[in-house]
């Protein structure tokens, strides 16, 4: 049973929690994270979701993703999801999420890191992750164009966002 903290529109804890799978009431919001891991060559680590996964089964996705559990910060959730799904440890101390997207049911923080990871270092979570690989910007675009990658609206800017230090290019 997965339990989430509920937030208000200002991203403040409400003191209430929610059980995953139950319908959120209007105005109830929760925190989701995505992690984008780039290697030293500038390639993005992506994962293929299991064929029986709820929501986007058998699609390629970003490095790791999930909901923050009760009591977790965005950083803690990001570190935990990477460890659970990919079997590697990351330390996001001293960093901030690259950006946060506000969606109908909450807030989605996107973390970007560069880490020298080898595919042989990964231990994939069998229940959620079918495969993992590194891709270039061009390979990611090909997966998006073929309908094999979850169609995030910002996908064509992902590699630009990786190096961005301001809101301007």
Curated annotation (Swiss-Prot):
A motif (Nudix box) lies at residues 65-87. InterPro entries: NUDIX_hydrolase-like_dom_sf, NUDIX_hydrolase_CS, NUDIX_hydrolase_dom. It holds the Pfam family NUDIX. This is Uncharacterized Nudix hydrolase lmo0368. It comes from Listeria monocytogenes serovar 1/2a (strain ATCC BAA-679 / EGD-e). Mg(2+) binds at residues 81, 85. Its EC number is 3.6.-.-. It is an enzyme of class 3 (hydrolase). Transmembrane segments: none annotated. Residues 28-157 form the Nudix hydrolase domain. Keywords: Hydrolase, Magnesium, Metal-binding. The keyword Nucleotide-binding does not apply. Belongs to the Nudix hydrolase family. GO terms for molecular function: hydrolase activity; metal ion binding. Its cofactor is Mg(2+).
């Amino acid at each position: 049973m997965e339990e989430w903290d509920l937030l208000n529109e200002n991203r403040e804890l409400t003191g209430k929690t929610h059980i995953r799978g139950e319908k959120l009431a209007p105005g109830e919001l929760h925190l989701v994270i995505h992690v984008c891991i780039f290697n030293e060559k500038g390639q993005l680590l992506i994962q293929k979701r299991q064929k029986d996964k709820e929501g986007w089964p058998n699609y390629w996705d970003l490095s790791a993703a999930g909901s923050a559990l009760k009591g977790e910060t965005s950083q803690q959730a990001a570190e935990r999801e990477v460890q659970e799904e990919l079997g590697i440890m990351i330390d996001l101390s001293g960093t901030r999420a690259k950006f946060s997207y506000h969606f109908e049911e909450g807030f989605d923080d996107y973390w970007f890191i560069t880490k020298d990871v080898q595919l042989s270092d990964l231990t994939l979570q069998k229940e959620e992750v079918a495969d993992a690989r590194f891709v270039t910007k061009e390979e990611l675009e090909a997966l998006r164009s073929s309908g094999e990658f979850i169609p995030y609206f910002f996908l064509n800017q992902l590699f630009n966002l990786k190096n961005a230090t301001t809101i301007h290019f």
